[in-house]
């Protein structure tokens, strides 16, 4: 069993980005600039945004954090999005999800200029990704592809089961694992809460990508010997022994599943750090105008 160390790989990628940015700046070019909008005080969102700002620092990017209270109106938020669309200094920006109930996430996503949509959530980026055109690929699936690549994990002709069908992970992940490229060329099955033979599908899978948000859902009896298991779940489970009062728990029952795997990602320290690094990669592409002029 080999542990896929997302933390170590993410540090490596950040150093690669920082070196490229240093080269751009040395030639008189502009530092990539990422802006983030944070609404309210959701614990998970606070943690993620802080990590994104810190990653920008390491990569040599300029970053801006724009904060609103949870009672901000949809109109006020959309006005800020339009302002960032027009701001030539901002290369890419994100609106941290989830948003309060009174704001339509879809409306916000569609208002973002797709050329600055470094989260890869805009329908234009999603559509381009699904037909294999250059675009900003959403961060978590992109991070998983990077891990498969860096560990030289074989995907061609492999049976890959994606657990979960969210727009953020499940659907794009299935599309990417089917693409005519490496990593890809896999035979993909998507399972979800309504699937009938989920356990049987998992037992036959060479690669399982678990993105359900259900702690410890994948158990040893669901995984065949030598499988590759990628755990996208990060649920905060109360834990009195931890200073924060909770521990991050994946969708995979790690201790019992790991011995059967050829490769497995831990939680934390697996997919999470790669998600942030993918956002940095997209921001660098935006700064270089590599995808959209």
Curated annotation (Swiss-Prot):
Catalyzed chemical reaction(s): (6R)-5,10-methylene-5,6,7,8-tetrahydrofolate + NADP(+) = (6R)-5,10-methenyltetrahydrofolate + NADPH; (6R)-5,10-methenyltetrahydrofolate + H2O = (6R)-10-formyltetrahydrofolate + H(+)
Annotated EC: 1.5.1.5, 3.5.4.9
Any one Gene Ontology cellular component term annotated for this protein: cytosol
Annotated residues for binding of NADP(+): 164-166, 193, 234
UniProt record, GO biological process: L-histidine biosynthetic process; methionine biosynthetic process; purine nucleotide biosynthetic process; tetrahydrofolate interconversion
Subunit description: Homodimer.
Family recorded in the similarity comment: Belongs to the tetrahydrofolate dehydrogenase/cyclohydrolase family.
Protein's name according to its UniProt entry: Bifunctional protein FolD
Organism: Phocaeicola vulgatus (strain ATCC 8482 / DSM 1447 / JCM 5826 / CCUG 4940 / NBRC 14291 / NCTC 11154) (Bacteroides vulgatus)
